UniProtKB/Swiss-Prot annotation:
Keyword ATP-binding in annotation: no
UniProt keywords, alphabetically: GTP-binding, Ligase, Manganese, Metal-binding, Nucleotide-binding, RNA repair
EC number in record: 6.5.1.8
Gene encoding the protein: rtcB1
Gene Ontology molecular function: any one: manganese ion binding
GO annotation, biological process: DNA repair; RNA processing; RNA repair
Protein name from the UniProt record: RNA-splicing ligase RtcB1
InterPro entries xrefs: RtcB (IPR001233), RtcB-like (IPR052915), RtcB-like_sf (IPR036025)
Catalytic activity: a 3'-end 3'-phospho-ribonucleotide-RNA + a 5'-end dephospho-ribonucleoside-RNA + GTP = a ribonucleotidyl-ribonucleotide-RNA + GMP + diphosphate; a 3'-end 2',3'-cyclophospho-ribonucleotide-RNA + a 5'-end dephospho-ribonucleoside-RNA + GTP + H2O = a ribonucleotidyl-ribonucleotide-RNA + GMP + diphosphate + H(+)
């Protein structure tokens, strides 16, 4: 048995956390969630677990007959995309700053501060590939905004194919054989945040009379068979599609940027299914487990069915992994979505300096300023320990090291 069993007054919690730290607040948050009467069998916890807003990051929450919107959160469909290119390290330019600049030009990122009307994190004039992907989203958007007009006043179309901020990133990486990979991390951007926030608030309002009886107000839920349950599932499915297409559009534009800098073909003919991977790690969907159809919420966790490829990034100074799932049913066929934080962003900014950031990322062409100190590698768990703790969930196919990193 490779997991720790945490017993509660209701469902148990199975934690793949051997050799990695788990803060007491995260344990209590997991216990609170496990108290809910509709938890199916047990909660599974990944080794990158840490305290989260709404629910615990690195948790897999299986439910029957209900869904907790705050467990999915506001970064709906957040996930990873990775592409193995036809390039090798020898093809990369000596000046990697030029490459980083080309990517930053190709993909809007960051957020506007102050009184500037221009949103630097959005497109002014979206390119053709964004238009094509928006066409796949338009029917769902029409339903969403007709039923909930509040979503008309959101960043949607102009956020498609954009990176965002925080821990979202685009990286150029090398594997063990010096093959070049493109890897990126983003979600459903402004519209997903708006959908998540609205339905979390709505669930709490709907349960206003009984809210105080819950272990936490963040555990407010929609019951299956109600209108809001159905609407939430439909809205979340749309946001998850937005997130997937968002990553696809960014990947296409990064490939184009690399080709313009290097004057070489970047994308090789696809011969293996795993050569391009696009996976969510913040989402909910219906799945079959232990012979029953249930709703699985992965909050900072990746699907790892037998033979399924996934992406587990480290921090901006640590290695990352392309993995293949082992289909461990006890984890609801899941694995970690990264290394996991060992401290809050606020604490990291107080504890570390720009000089620390420069030293920790000396081998990476990336931002090294005060605004990204909260993403310093030391703010995250040891990725090797995280991988060791989930050796029965996934097998490593490629180990990547980054050479260029773009942050919002």
């Amino acid at each position: 048995m490779n997991y720790e069993l945490l017993t509660t007054e209701n469902a148990p919690v199975k934690m793949w956390t051997k050799g990695v730290p788990v803060e007491a607040d995260a344990r209590q948050q997991l216990i609170n969630t496990a108290k809910m009467p509709f938890i199916f069998k047990h909660i599974a916890v990944m080794p990158d677990v840490h305290l989260g807003k709404g629910s615990t990051i690195g948790s897999v929450i299986p439910t029957k007959g209900a869904i907790i919107p705050a467990a999915v959160g506001v970064d709906i469909g957040c996930g990873m995309n990775a592409l193995r290119t036809a390039l090798t390290a020898a093809d990369l330019p000596e000046n990697l700053a030029e490459l980083r600049q080309a990517i930053e030009t190709a993909v809007p990122h960051g957020r506007t501060t102050g009184r500037c009307k221009r949103d630097k994190g959005a497109w002014e004039n979206p390119p053709v590939n964004v238009d094509a992907k928006w066409a796949e989203l338009e029917a769902g958007y029409q339903w969403l905004t007709q039923k909930y007009p509040r979503f008309l006043n959101t960043n949607n179309y102009k956020h498609l194919g954009t990176l965002g901020t925080g821990n979202h990133f685009i990286e150029i990486c090398l594997d063990e054989s010096d093959q070049v990979w493109i890897m990126l991390h983003s979600g459903s951007r402004g519209i997903g945040n708006a959908i998540g926030t609205y339905f979390i608030d709505l669930a709490q309002k709907e349960m206003q009379e009984t809210l105080e009886t819950l272990p936490s107000r963040d555990l407010a839920y929609f019951m299956e068979g109600t209108e809001y349950f159905d609407d939430y599932l439909k809205a979340v499915a749309w946001a998850q599609l937005f997130a997937s297409l968002n990553r696809d559009a960014m990947m296409e534009n990064v490939v184009t940027a690399l080709q313009s800098v290097m004057q070489k073909t970047v994308k090789q003919p696809q011969t293996l299914a795993m050569e391009e991977i696009n996976c969510h790690h913040n989402y909910v969907q219906k799945e079959l487990h232990f012979g029953e159809e249930i709703y699985v919420t992965r909050k900072g966790a990746v699907s790892a069915r037998a033979g399924q490829y996934g992406i587990i990034p480290g921090s901006m100074g640590a290695k990352s992994f392309i993995v293949r799932g082992l289909g461990n049913e006890e984890s609801f066929c899941s694995c970690s979505h990264g290394a996991g934080r060992v401290m809050s962003r606020t604490k990291a900014k107080k504890l570390f300096s720009v000089e620390d950031q420069i030293r920790a990322t000396a081998h990476v062409e990336c931002r090294k300023d005060a605004e990204v100190i909260d993403e310093i590698p030391m703010a995250y768990k040891d990725i090797d320990a995280v991988m060791a703790a989930q050796s029965d969930l996934v097998e490593v196919i490629y180990t990547l090291r980054q050479v260029v990193c773009v942050k919002g």
